[in-house]
Structures are given as structure tokens and as C-alpha cells.
Amino acid sequence: MAMTVSSGDTTAHLDVDRILSLFQLSKEQLHMVMCRLREEMERGLSRDTYQEAPVRMLPTFICSLPAGRVNGSFLALDLGGTNFQVLRVRFGSPCEGVKHVVSETYRISHELMQASGQQLFDYIVDCIARFLSNQNIKEPLSLGFTFSFPYKQIGLDQGILLNWTKGFNIPHCVGKDVVQLLREAIQRWQVPMGSHNS
């Protein structure tokens, strides 16, 4: 069975090809992009230029990766915008890797995004306490805290908030160690926790 192609289909196909061709880069153009990206990363690494560099290259203080030696259960916290997520991640043997993940997501209201730092971090710890209760977790677990805002990490478990994004506006937190703010809220709520890492 033969298919017929209308002139309208051919014209549309040519239009798509023409538009796609605008996004195809030559080897020379790709090399220019690579060089420019490298320049910007080097500016971000330099003590003299990192402050104004578009690609900030701040140290993470992570000196090595676990290499399969991690086992047991851990809490993972993720504050990334209008949602806050609490996860329990269970690692098995090196061969098994991640065995099980359970998570709950909590909404961050617009009002809370404009509230005080204490209110925000108290809410975060309230969510952690609810998660622990919902999952019937009684033992203290070590936790990792993903804080998806610009911050300067000054140690493995220390991070100074540079500025808020994503609609948050809590000036009191800017310039403060967000891990310490979390620790203080955990102490206020008396939630049993293991060690904390940002």
C-alpha cells in the first residue's frame, strides 16, 4: 500500500528541519562553548574573581565518597522550594546498594516563605516529627540536609545562606548557618536525631 504525502506535510517537514538546523552546533562552536565554560569555571575558582563569577565554584568539603561502605537507615531532608521532602533511605550491603526508600512531601505555604527563620525551621522539624511518627521510626537516625538555595559551605555540616530564591524572603536567615538553624529547631522540638550533614 502506497502512502501519499501532501505538499502541506512536505512544507511542515521542511519548516521543522529549518528550525532544528538553528540548534545544530558545529565542532568549532562546541569548542567555543567548552572554552567559555572552562573560563567561567576558572573565574569561579579564583579567589580574585569568584564573587562576581556567573558560575560559582564553592567548596563542598566532601573529601571522599562512601565506596559501598554505607549500610543502615538514614534520613534525607530536601528543602527546594514550595515543597519540603523527608525520606528514609535504607542501604544494604555493597552489592545491594539502596534497599528501600520511603518519602513524604510537605507543602511550604507562601506565608511560611515570608515568615521568620524560626517559624520555617520549626515547621521543617514538625514535618520530620510527623514523618518519624507516620513511619513508626523510634531510633535516632543520621541525616543529610539538601538545601537548594545559594549558600557558602564552610564545613561539611556548616552552610551560610547567601540569599533566598524561589519566592522565599526571610531576611533574618541570610548570613546565618542554616544547619545550625536546623539543629536549634531540632533541640527546641526535642526530636531525637543522629549526626547531621548538609
Can you describe what each PLM-predicted range is?
Residues 1-75:
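N-terminal charged helix/coil linker that caps or initiates catalytic domains
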Residues 69-70, 97-99, 134-141, 191-197:
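Short helix-terminating capping/connector loops at secondary-structure junctions
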Residues 73-75, 121-140:
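Short amphipathic alpha-helices and their capping/turn segments at secondary-structure boundaries
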Residues 82, 148-152:
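Short glycine-rich anion-binding loops that position phosphate/pyrophosphate groups of nucleotides
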Residues 103-125, 151-198:
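Glycine-rich phosphate-binding loop and adjoining helix at the ATP-binding site
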